[in-house]
């Protein structure tokens, strides 16, 4: 009986322990990296999703503009005093009317999105590049109020209700030359620097976000996606 009890209480043999250790080692080498990449994959996914949302918003504004102004022959008749840009007919998105199109004293409204004869989204504000960020913020659901987060310092703005850090990457305050970058808050710290985001940036280990440069009259907006640093 003592022998049977002893056999029933016996543990793993040395060979069995070695086999278990080897199996755990294989799992650590093959499976662990896949789990570690989940955050990176998630960041890359949301970045691509935001880029798609921006493209869709720009295309929507362009389509509505073409339907509104496409056959009216209004090019060159009006100048908006806020932006100072020549040869553009401007009205508030979804609020276009004859009064908007005939008044040369028409003023832009903060926080609104406007249509132009070029068909690309623009802001009616007169404070330059930093404020034109509102044009895109107003079209996206990022937990950012377009009338509140209008200027972004060198460290970017990280609204508490948003999952994004937003940078003003404009080199000057010319309304024709404004740009911004959106970086996920969950991205690696190495990616949270606006110097890595421009129209000339190459996607690299330090980039994880979306770069947007506003339209310049007939030119379409520039939208670039960076995911290698996510």
Predicted feature residues:
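N-terminal leader/signal peptides at the extreme start of proteins
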Residues: 1-10
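Alpha-helix exit/C-cap motif
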Residues: 56-74
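Membrane-proximal amphipathic alpha-helices
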Residues: 40-51
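Alpha-helical hydrophobic helix detector
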Residues: 18-33
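N-terminal Rossmann-like NAD(P) cofactor-binding subdomain of oxidoreductases
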Residues: 36
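Intrinsically disordered, low-complexity regions enriched in Pro/Ser/Thr/Gly and acidic residues
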Residues: 82-230
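Extended amphipathic alpha-helical segments with heptad-repeat/coiled-coil character used for oligomerization
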Residues: 73-84
